[in-house]
Amino acid sequence: MNMAKDIKFSADARAAMVRGVDMLADTVKVTLGPKGRNVVLEKAFGSPLITNDGVTIAKEIELEDHFENMGAKLVSEVASKTNDIAGDGTTTATVLTQAIVHEGLKNVTAGANPIGIRRGIETATATAVEALKAIAQPVSGKEAIAQVAAVSSRSEKVGEYISEAMERVGNDGVITIEESRGMETELEVVEGMQFDRGYLSQYMVTDNEKMVADLENPFILITDKKVSNIQDILPLLEEVLKTNRPLLIIADDVDGEALPTLVLNKIRGTFNVVAVKAPGFGDRRKAMLEDIAILTGGTVITEDLGLELKDATMTALGQAAKITVDKDSTVIVEGSGSSEAIANRIALIKSQLETTTSDFDREKLQERLAKLAGGVAVIKVGAPTETALKEMKLRIEDALNATRAAVEEGIVAGGGTALITVIEKVAALELEGDDATGRNIVLRALEEPVRQIALNAGYEGSVVIDKLKNSPAGTGFNAATGEWVDMIKTGIIDPVKVTRSALQNAASVASLILTTEAVVANKPEPAAPAPAMPAGMDPGMMGGF
């Protein structure tokens, strides 16, 4: 059964949506800048969440009026999209959307053609984005990375953790954020490739106290077959034995007489050998074995390639500087694979990441990428209370995303300053009629983040903007101290990717709202009357269960 619909047209439709845009944007924009305030979100269970993270707040907002709610949801979409692309800048995106919608609406109401305005907005936005990229400064080196992370998280300590993590595992490495048991935030790094499979027999350990097997400069046999018959691998074992180096066997399983034979040789000291099961399942297992082979310079011995264990030679074995195996996991450090082959494999996984639609696949591909690229770092977040912990975790996630974005596309002066810097380029666009109106709307919107940051810190926005326009490039207003400073030197910076995504997403959704002519919403259903009680039934009886 289709629900009845409520429909609003042109000015009515836009006005209702703008009310929703305003409700959401006004709630989110109080968090912008160093003096941004917090917003408290009620949670159905547990303590309320206190946050200044734009996208978290935007996702919580649900309005009663269907038309207003649609406006709010569109802005929430801008915040989410910016968060997905750049991981930060959600509040800036919200402020820009609101500014473009308001300026645009004035002109549409006064009779301008929304399609012309939209064209102008798109042209101006593209010009602003090019200008931002042109003034970007690259970020490299531990100090620069620490500075970017410290600005985003408002904590120098967090900045140090993130730059340390990125230095240790590389820019493509996986950095995860977990909750710590204690009060302190700390960093743990697993270098090399780790997978969740331990030794098949505890008699294979080399250190009885720690119960781990350390293999220095080992050979690695990689196969998706079961090893049950020792005769299958005997020729290989004899060759490895001559080199006096240890061997790691990664196989579907090692059982039958093969396992006790290997263990016996290990105990006698003839031969240092450790066997582990292959990681993953199904197709993912094949891909992971291939990753290990590429990392170590070996070949996967598999029927898919028509290879048999008994025919394998030393050239099929991978090598590494060191391997550590405990009862649950194996870590391969410094595999001997060619850096070119590893780079090609990383590029292949990255292209699969771009095309996959499944979140689960994306997560698994990301893990494989990290393992090939250099390791996994875990930042364990500690805080005195649960509420503080949640808030801290969100801040660190933001900082990590902002830092990655900065390394990718460079940085510009923060605090909305860069958006004012590009005004000159946008103003120079020669456009006519409604297109020119669209450009002017963007020009006005580019001032809005600075205005809001100043307002939140208790300063007069227009005064700050006027002074900023007449200041040398790179000089900006530090809202935390009220001083005029060289923004980048002071460490007040924004990743270009964040600023650019915020502007592009805001312009895109705001122009959609301006070109809306009708809005269709579901009519609220009248509440169904409560069923009458059967005669003679005592209402008190209902509570007896």
UniProtKB/Swiss-Prot annotation:
Annotated localization: Cytoplasm
Predominant localisation class: cytoplasm
Residues that bind ATP: 31-34, 88-92, 415, 478-480, 494
InterPro entries in UniProt: Chaperonin_Cpn60_CS, Cpn60/GroEL, Cpn60/GroEL/TCP-1, GroEL-like_apical_dom_sf, GROEL-like_equatorial_sf, TCP-1-like_intermed_sf
Keyword Chaperone found: yes
CC annotations in GO: cytoplasm
Record keywords, A-Z: ATP-binding, Chaperone, Cytoplasm, Isomerase, Nucleotide-binding
Gene Ontology molecular-function annotations: ATP binding; ATP-dependent protein folding chaperone; isomerase activity; unfolded protein binding
Enzyme Commission identifier(s): 5.6.1.7
Any Pfam family hit: Cpn60_TCP1
Catalyzed reaction equations: ATP + H2O + a folded polypeptide = ADP + phosphate + an unfolded polypeptide
Alphabetized SUPFAM superfamilies for the sequence: GroEL apical domain-like, GroEL equatorial domain-like, GroEL-intermediate domain like
Top-rank lineage group of the source organism: Bacteria
Gene3D superfamilies assigned: GroEL (3.50.7.10), GroEL-like equatorial domain (1.10.560.10), TCP-1-like chaperonin intermediate domain (3.30.260.10)
GO BP of this protein: protein refolding
Family: Belongs to the chaperonin (HSP60) family.
Assembly notes: Forms a cylinder of 14 subunits composed of two heptameric rings stacked back-to-back. Interacts with the co-chaperonin GroES.
Protein name per Swiss-Prot or TrEMBL: Chaperonin GroEL
Organism ancestry: Bacteria, Bacillati, Bacillota, Bacilli, Lactobacillales
